Amino acid sequence: MQTLHALLRDIPAPDAEAMARAQQHIDGLLKPPGSLGRLETLAVQLAGMPGLNGTPQVGEKAVLVMCADHGVWDEGVAVSPKIVTAIQAANMTRGTTGVCVLAAQAGAKVYVIDVGIDAEPIPGVVDMRVARGCGNIAVGPAMSRSQAEALLLEVSRYTCDLAQRGVTLFGVGELGMANTTPAAAMVSVFTGSDAKEVVGIGANLPPSRIDNKVDVVRRAIAINQPNPRDGIDVLSKVGGFDLVGMTGVILGAARCGLPVLLDGFLSYSAALAACQIAPAVRPYLIPSHFSAEKGARIALAHLSMEPYLHMAMRLGEGSGAALAMPIVEAACAMFHNMGELAASNIVLPEGNANAT
């Protein structure tokens, strides 16, 4: 049975030769070189992923939604009742939530995964529950390090199993009342930013309660003293089961040499953790949308990422990842279906990249 250490060790490097071939092919397509902008760079990125066999392509698509409750909800950092996590998880199994509708439109399957819902088991939800909610980070750690490591490994294996069954494009999502608080704590730790700079309204927290949320994040960091150079330490001390789960999806997809679409602010925090745990995951990450949550810009700057969509979204659930899947497919279509300049006897002068 593979250990977490072995999984991290086996994350492949991108295929530089395949990327060079892809760039050469794209430059010869029926258009001025570079005129399709980031669609071209996305195709080259995909070509370098070993799990796609040297060419941009999309098979089955999946959005993995990690569902869990948080002890820090008790600190008054969320307006929604905790039971909403379980209610919405059940709604996901019926296909009626935002991510389900957007994923269906994109032709993707949604996997609803219970990693720590504080309720009875829900039919149709994948059971990876660690506990009924994590610890209150304002008074102590979210979980033990061993719990975090075990969940990372379990989710990574599950992701790789889906890859073996034909999934080639993953999206990450989450569901959990109060989970923007631990996400803000993680972003604060990884980026060295004060809580005031990264704490937002989450699911419509009234402005009058923001200062309390900022204070809770500061207390969580002061009490737990997470090490910013140790991603698992940060996850276990000021994270949550859903955040660990998303990190596991990223690690698993990278291990299989496959792309993973990030969602919003919660996924940025998981990406920061994943990149700290295993820097080799970075080339497999695709940012979907620019979250409207306050700390998004800081997190994305630290990740050196510019999302493809600016939609003022902050729903979470993996909604942005689902919405961006057609962009990935468009990059593949461009690569495979456009004609070539040579076939039409077109010779463009050098330096024509900006031609229209």
Swiss-Prot record:
Pathway: Nucleoside biosynthesis; alpha-ribazole biosynthesis; alpha-ribazole from 5,6-dimethylbenzimidazole: step 1/2
Domain of life: Bacteria
Keywords: Cobalamin biosynthesis, Glycosyltransferase, Transferase
GO biological process, one term: cobalamin biosynthetic process
Keyword Glycosyltransferase among UniProt keywords: yes
Annotated catalytic residues: 317
Keyword flag RNA-binding: no
Catalytic activity entry: 5,6-dimethylbenzimidazole + nicotinate beta-D-ribonucleotide = alpha-ribazole 5'-phosphate + nicotinate + H(+)
Subunit note: Homodimer.
Family as reported in the entry's similarity comment: Belongs to the CobT family.
Record function comment: Catalyzes the synthesis of alpha-ribazole-5'-phosphate from nicotinate mononucleotide (NAMN) and 5,6-dimethylbenzimidazole (DMB).
HAMAP family the UniProt entry points to: CobT (MF_00230)
Full protein name: Nicotinate-nucleotide--dimethylbenzimidazole phosphoribosyltransferase
